[in-house]
Amino acid sequence: MSSLLNYKNSGVNIETGNNFINIIKNITKSEHIGGFSGVYECKNGTKLVASTDGVGSKLELCNILDKYDTIGIDLVAMCVNDIICQGATPLFFLDYYAMGKLNLDIASKIITGINEGCKQSNCLLLGGETAEMPITYKNDKHFDLAGFSVGIIENEIYPKQITENDLLFGLKSTGIHSNG
C-alpha cells in the first residue's frame, strides 16, 4: 500500500519540476532559485527572506467537509515555515484568493483563518488580492488560495553545519497539514 502513496503515482513528476527549476535558473541567471524560500541581501547588510506557496489539494478537503475556517491558518504556515527554516523572523504576509464567484460566507471564514495564522506567526497581514474569475473557476467552491511571506534574518542558520548527532526536535502535529 505505501508504495502507492508517492508523488509519481499521484500524477506529480518531481524530475520535471526539477528540470523546470533549471530552466528558470538559466533564464534568470540566478543561483538562488530552487530552495523553499529566497534570501535577498539589502545594501545595509540586512537579509530579507521571502516565500510563496499554496495549500494544494487540501482545498478538496475543505469542500468535502464544508469547512473553511482553518485553511487560512495552513496557508500562512506553508509560507512562514519556508522562511523560518532559513532563520528568518516573519514580518508580513499577503494572500491571493481566486474563485469563480465570491461567496462572502466562505471568503470571511478563509480570511479569518489567514488572520489567525498571522497572529500565530507574529506577522502582519499586509494585504492581498481577491480575484473573481467565473470563466476560469466553475463556482464559489472552486477556488485557489496562495500566500506570500517576508521575514528578516536576525540569527543565521547554516544548514551545512548540521551534522550527525545534532539534536533534532519533533513537534506534535495539530492535524492534517497542507502539501503545498
Predicted regions, residues:
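Helix-biased detector of long, well-ordered alpha-helical tracts
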Residues: M1-G180
